[in-house]
From Swiss-Prot:
Subcellular location: Nucleus, Nucleolus; Nucleus, Nucleoplasm
Molecular functions (GO terms): ribonucleoprotein complex binding; RNA binding
Pfam family name, one: Pescadillo_N
InterPro entries hit by this protein: BRCT_dom, BRCT_dom_sf, PES
GO biological process, one term: maturation of LSU-rRNA from tricistronic rRNA transcript (SSU-rRNA, 5.8S rRNA, LSU-rRNA)
Name of the gene this protein is made from: NOP7
Family label: Belongs to the pescadillo family.
Protein name listed in UniProt: Pescadillo homolog
Acidic residues: bias regions: 479-496
Gene Ontology cellular-component terms listed: nucleoplasm; PeBoW complex; preribosome, large subunit precursor
The species this protein was found in: Laccaria bicolor (strain S238N-H82 / ATCC MYA-4686)
Length: 606
């Protein structure tokens, strides 16, 4: 007969530990326990039976793995936290007694813990660290935009700003930026580092206020970990690229609001390669070179071959050449020079032939980062800060990024000539060119014009709306209209007819969705008669469906009958979401092409 198990000594009661018992076991405060869990990556678990895990109690509580708590008990950071607690008691006692010399001595020798070992434990390889850098970048860029308060010291903000600038400098140098999206929360960037996609969010440059209900202590603990992680990653990236880390900062440029231009990237100066010489080793007072070692090895092999009759005699000519052969050093696979010599794609140097100038109302840090990441040259007015490579009157400027309405004003002949030689575009043109991977036409993005929809480039699921592959064709947006105004109107009618047909095909089964398609067609400028004719035509086609469609529907119904209730609900949910996506794609196509056709008509009228 097996031994009886005592209640609460095995199973879930042994594998899980409540938060209260974990704090008692570690002998630390709740704040220190939270900090340890954040730094070590330990989070609450949900047992199958909360009552069994809590030894029969049904009180609400948080559970942790017992092995995780035992893992925390040997953490060096926990030891430093205990030392800091004792240090705080001694310091308060010395200040209370007025012992200023001892208090100063305690302050100079206060315990400080490091997180290097935690980074190595949580991220064994460099690729693991790069995969988990998204949250670190978002947190660092967030704190870099916050004002300093009593809870946020200036040193912390300066360190976050420095890390953010170093990351942007590396992205610009390596030309790793791939996608950009302007949202309400901020600017989403996506880069490709070591074949890993990294996405982060940068808030707009507005005055930020920390809400009172936000626990800053928890965020500061995360920031402490993320700063160390980002420092490790940047050091590795800069070293592999052959750059000095940290990049030197020019204090004068920084004081004059030069931004990331205050940092200078410097290549690592490698010593000149000396001619290869045979390494000499002293043995019993006599120098032995590598040639002597090779000769000794050959003699040993020759002696073995004489004793073994099965081994064939080697050619003496080849033997002499092998003895005289010198060691040839091979290039390392992680040579920093090889990384910069890799061929770059055309999209990474998208703006290299162009020179941009920022108007005063456009955000300089955002668009300077975008343009320089794709090889372009950019300048700005003196009100943005120092460091502009050229002035507004420079004749090499090809594009002016402007975000103000078009207002008529008197211009001198020289100003008019300068304006005609440049192209004035709105900021969205830069972002859409980056996401499409090519230079788009400047016409729809001209100054004062209604912009086309700015869609997220992160919708990569199958069936997502692609503006370049709409009913107008992949190159329909890029083609210039060289015909007269009447030909443009005829083409618009044909395109609108195709749009209506694409929309109606997706929604003819539901009257509510059909009404939505009718409103969308009306907004696109299609009359009701044309829309009604398309609906009737499609209904007739559906009535003349072949019998095979009915057979397929019957097979689907039979398969559905064999499903369980859970599988049926999942199948219906999947079909509903698929149909909803098709409707959204059709509506997006109608609205976008209506805007594009109106902008093309406006260009021809002009």
């Amino acid at each position: 007969m097996g031994r009886l198990k005592q209640k609460g000594k095995a199973g879930a009661a042994k594998n899980y530990v409540t938060r209260t018992s974990a704090i008692k076991k570690l002998q630390c405060s709740l704040a220190d326990f939270r900090r340890l869990c954040i730094l070590k990556g330990i989070f609450p678990r949900e047992p199958r039976s909360r009552k069994r895990a809590n030894k029969g109690s049904s009180a609400p509580t948080s559970f942790y793995y017992a092995k995780d708590i035992a893992y925390l008990a040997h953490e060096p950071v926990l030891k430093k936290l205990r030392e800091h607690k004792a240090f705080a008691k001694k310091l308060s006692r010395a200040l209370g007694r007025g012992e200023w010399s001892s208090a100063k001595n305690l302050e100079e020798n206060k315990p400080i813990y490091r997180l290097d070992h935690i980074i190595k434990e949580r991220y064994p390889t460099f690729i693991d660290a790069v995969r988990d850098i998204d949250d670190a970048l978002c947190m660092v860029f967030l704190f870099a935009s916050l004002p300093t308060t009593t809870r946020l010291p200036p040193e912390l903000m300066e360190n976050c700003s420095r890390l953010a600038a170093e990351w942007q400098l590396y992205i610009m140098r390596s030309q790793s930026l791939r996608k950009v999206f302007l949202s309400i929360k901020g600017v989403y960037y996506q880069a490709e580092i070591m074949d890993q996609t990294v996405t982060w969010l940068v808030p707009y440059q507005f005055t930020q206020n920390i809400p009172a209900d936000v626990d800053v202590r928890v965020m500061l603990t995360f920031l402490e970990l993320y700063q160390t992680l980002l420092g490790f990653i940047l050091f590795k990236l800069y070293t592999d690229a052959g750059l000095v880390y940290p990049p030197p900062l020019d204090a004068k440029k920084d004081e004059s609001a030069a931004g990331i231009g205050a940092f200078s990237l410097q290549d690592i100066t490698q010593p000149a390669a000396q001619p290869s010489r045979a390494k000499a080793v002293e043995l019993d007072g006599r120098k032995i070179s590598t040639k002597d070692v090779r000769q000794t090895i050959k003699n040993i092999e020759a002696s073995h071959s004489t004793h073994d009759p099965d081994v064939e005699m080697s050619n003496p000519e080849t033997a002499t050449t092998e003895v005289e052969e010198e060691f040839i050093s091979q290039a390392s696979l992680s040579n920093p020079g090889l990384i910069s010599s890799l061929p770059q794609s055309l999209s990474t140097s998208l703006f290299s032939p162009y020179t941009f100038f920022l108007s005063r109302e456009v955000s300089r840090p955002i668009f300077e980062f975008m343009v320089r990441s794709f090889g372009g040259k950019i300048g700005w007015s003196a009100s943005f800060g120092s460091g502009s490579p050229f002035e507004e009157t420079d004749e090499t400027i090809t594009h002016v990024i402007i975000d103000r309405p078009l207002v008529g004003r008197e211009e001198s002949p020289s100003q008019r000539e300068l304006r005609l030689r440049r192209k004035y575009v709105q900021p969205q043109w830069i972002v859409d060119c980056i996401n499409s991977g090519k230079i788009l036409l400047e016409g729809p993005y001209g100054q004062g014009k209604t912009l086309p929809p700015h869609l997220s480039p992160f919708g990569e699921y199958e069936g997502a709306y692609d503006p370049a592959a709409g009913p107008l064709g992949p190159s329909g947006v890029e083609q210039e209209s060289e015909s007269e105004a009447d030909e443009v109107s005829e083409e618009d009618e044909e395109d609108q007819g195709g749009l209506v047909q694409a929309a109606v095909e997706a929604v003819t089964g539901d009257p509510v969705e059909l009404r939505a398609a009718e409103l969308a067609a009306e907004a696109a400028g299609v009359d009701y008669g044309t829309f009604e004719a398309k609906v009737k035509k499609l209904n007739k086609k559906q009535m003349k469906k072949p019998i095979t469609d009915g057979v397929e529907d019957g097979e689907k119904d039979m398969n559905k009958m064999m499903m369980s209730n859970k599988q049926k609900k999942l199948y219906e949910k999947m079909k509903y979401s698929q149909k909803k996506k098709e409707i959204e794609v059709s509506k997006f196509g109608i609205s976008l092409d209506a805007v594009l056709t109106s902008s093309i008509a406006g260009d021809t009228d002009y």
